[in-house]
Each structure stands twice: as structure tokens, then as C-alpha cells.
Amino acid sequence: MELSELKEWLDELYDRYDSPDFIENDPIAIPHSFSKQEDIELCGFLSATIAWGNRKMIVRNAFRLMERMDRAPFDFTCNASEQELNRLCDFTHRTFNGGDCIDFIRGLRHICRSYGSLGRFFETEYSANGDLRVVFSRFRTRFFEAEHRPHAEKHLSSIDRGAACKRLCMFLKWMVRNDSRGVDFGLWKTIPASALYLPLDIHTGNTARALGLLHRRQNDWRAVEEVTEALRQLDPLDPIKYDFALFGAGINGLLR
């Protein structure tokens, strides 16, 4: 398929799938239930953190987590007492357990107290160096400066170890992109959509390989860079708009 034909096809899929009609069973549905920016940011991060496995289970468990945080994730993160944090002890999503959840709240609290909010961390750090790869590394380092158990570290991928950082890339997409379609939020104005990286998983990876957008076999950070650079050839200003298009084509068997 010629590049122009591929772009036309992916643009059609983007128009089909990048719509509020398709987000009911997507993890982005949970932060859409909030209106305050700081709540959207923290809910979005925690929802993205548990975004693996069955999508309906992800959404259900993320809503359960928000209920335990009194549907006020920013206030809970910054101000919850130890007794209130213990409400999270029996929360589980697959291998993400209650102890991990509490450790993540501690990490987020450390970030929010240091920078004022989660968004201010990412915007401040991006403004300082202009490279999301550096920001991802800095975020993980600062996040785990807070007290935590080693088990929690497995749930925040390390770009320094070559991980694809799918959930962090997805969270950044939600916060940065603004296409006025009511899907992504576009809250962080100082980070351009052109700087984002594709949230790479088995579905988007296999679809990208089938389309010739990705040749690397492993779904690691080098693959993320390769496929993102290919998508920038299709749309330099907003390459990650094709995320839903690749995902939808993969799970709906459009390449068969």
C-alpha cells in the first residue's frame, strides 16, 4: 500500500473510532466522569495504570477505586490519613494489589506536593528539556522517591530499561491531545501533540507490522520510537491520532 493510500485508510479509521461513542468501555471513560483538572489528571493516571486485561474489568475496577477515594482523587491523594489510605488495602486489579495502590498514592502525593499537581510536573519538566523520554525517566525517579515496596515498581515501566511505557504514553495522549472530538482532554497546553509517542501494545504492534509501519519484533521502546516516527510521516503535528485507528483495525480484524 502506498503511503498516501495508507494515510487515507487510517484517516477513515480515525474518523470512525476517535469518537465519544466508542469510549464507554475504554479506560478514558473514567476521567471523563470528572470536571476538575486535578481530578481528571489523577484519575487518568490511576486508570491508565491498571489498563491491561479485559477492558470492561478495567473500567469497573477503576470506578471502584474512585469510589474508595470518595470520588475526589486529588483531595484524597494529597490529604488522606493513614486510616483513609487503608481503605485501599483490599483493592486488586490482576497483579496490582492494595499495597501497590497505596504506594502509588504516596508517589502521586510526593509529585503533587513538590510541583502543585501532576500536570505541572509534566509541563514543567517538558519545558525544561523538550524531550518526553527524559520526562518519563525523571517522573519514575521522582515518583519512587516516596516510601514504597519494591513490588510497586513493576507497575510503572522504566524507559531507562527499554520498556515500551504503554500506559504512560496512553496517559500523556489523554492529557495532551485536543482534537475537539470529546475523547482526549487537551489539558496540558505546553506539550505539543507532535511530541507524543504511540501507546504500543500487542494489538497496535501487530497492526503496525502488518501495515509496514513497524519492523522490530519486540514491543519495546525502540519499537515505540520506530512506529511513532512512521506515523509522523503521515501526520507530523498529530501522529498519535492514529492510536484508535490501529487498535480498532487490529481487534476488529480489518486486515484479514
Task: Give the label of every model feature segment.
Residues 1-256:
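HhH-family (HhH-GPD) DNA N-glycosylase catalytic core used in base-excision repair
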